[in-house]
Amino acid sequence: RIEDTIQELVNLYGSRAVIVVICGNNAKLKESLENQCKGHPNVIIQGFTKKIPLYMDACDVLFSKPGGLTSTEAAVKGVPLIHTAPIPGCENRNAAFFARRGMSYYCQEPAQQAKYAKLLCENQFLRFRMAEAQRRNTNAGSAEEICGLLRQAVGSDEVTSCMF
């Protein structure tokens, strides 16, 4: 539960860290977390935003369920990543894929998630090693490569750009 992870982080860091939680369109979760985090000015609860890339750039550690899009975006950006509780099925496989390659830590226990965050924040070598594993295992230029393959497949240079 995200509520438990937030509490573990608050217990571990107190006011020494800013914790930003992005709830997307989940208004019920946002309201619940706002109520839980009253009195903790260093915990920011955010609803839907189009500024996810900026938040990722600013964060020291990203907690996320192991969905493909957020996980891949974090890996391409070299953001230290802790995968939390997956939705059964492909997210289990995503978490295992990332963790086996050193691209994330994977843990469903909130206390352990907080400990992993502390390790990543305090140990530059661990952050570097994870970012290096992410770099080795992702291709930031894959969209352009796909466009090139599409150009070859249609036998035309009329495909000038791809928007994703």
Language model features by range: what are they?
Residues R1-A58:
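Donor-nucleotide binding loops and adjacent catalytic segments primarily
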Residues L29-L33, T70, G89-A95:
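Short, glycine/polar-rich helix-capping loops at beta-to-alpha or helix-loop-helix junctions
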Residues P53, S71-K77, A96:
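Short alpha-helical segment that forms part of, or immediately flanks, the ligand-binding pocket
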Residues D57-P66:
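Acidic donor-binding loop of glycosyltransferase active sites
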Residues C59-D60, G78-P80:
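A short alpha->beta transition loop at the rim of the catalytic pocket in nucleotide-sugar-dependent
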Residues K77-G78, R93-M103:
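Acidic, glycine-centered active-site loop in nucleotide-sugar glycosyltransferases
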Residues A99-L126:
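C-terminal "capping" alpha-helix adjacent to the active site of nucleotide-linked donor transferases
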Residues Q124-F164:
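C-terminal amphipathic helix plus adjacent low-complexity
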